[in-house]
Design a protein with these regions (language model features):
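Ser/Thr/Pro-rich, acidic low-complexity intrinsically disordered regulatory segments
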Residues: 2, 37, 44-45, 140
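Ser/Thr/Gly-rich flexible loops in soluble cytosolic domains mediating phosphotransfer, phosphorylation
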Residues: 51, 108-142
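A generic structural motif
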Residues: 57-66
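Mid-chain, well-packed structural core segment of small domains
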Residues: 79-114
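Structural motif
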Residues: 74-81, 136
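N-terminal, charge-rich interaction modules
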Residues: 2-38
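Short beta->alpha junction loops
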Residues: 67-76, 128-130
């Protein structure tokens, strides 16, 4: 299974206790030269991970308890996300642009939205537009 889960610790401030699940495609599995990813010039796996990690650290510094959940393109994605949802109650679920904006990933996006709706109906959704604006997306909602 090609997944990666990382956790950060929350700091004591106004956002302490707010938990966030960051869901996205595992960048190591993405072919950034494919036409579907032409909208993201210069992106590669290392840049995506660096952006996600930096924003995860930024959220932790703001007091959020964050967990990153990286999935494949659908073979195990639902099971991987469901496992995270069963481990913890999240206040906010962020689903990355790689899942949402690539037309071939539309069905995966739809499945993940319905999965979260069923297993975490209280959670807010937020959406980033690139790996480096995840913190802003979270802060809009919690």
């Amino acid at each position: 299974m090609n997944t990666e889960t990382q956790s950060t610790t929350r700091n004591a401030n106004a956002t302490t206790g707010k938990s966030v699940l960051i869901v996205g495609l595992d960048p190591a599995l993405i072919d950034f030269s494919a036409p579907a990813f032409a909208a993201f010039p210069g992106m590669n796996a290392a840049r995506v991970m660096a952006g996600l990690t930096a924003d995860q650290e930024r959220l932790a510094a703001l007091g959020y308890d964050t967990r990153m959940c990286l999935t494949d393109f659908g073979e195990t994605a639902e099971a991987v996300v469901l496992a995270q949802l069963k481990q913890k109650q999240f206040d906010c679920i962020m689903i990355g642009a790689g899942v949402r904006v690539i037309p071939t990933h539309f069905i995966l996006f739809e499945k993940l939205i319905n999965l979260v709706h069923e297993h975490a109906p209280h959670a807010r959704f937020c959406f980033n537009t690139k790996p480096t604006d995840t913190a802003e997306a979270v802060q809009r909602w919690i």
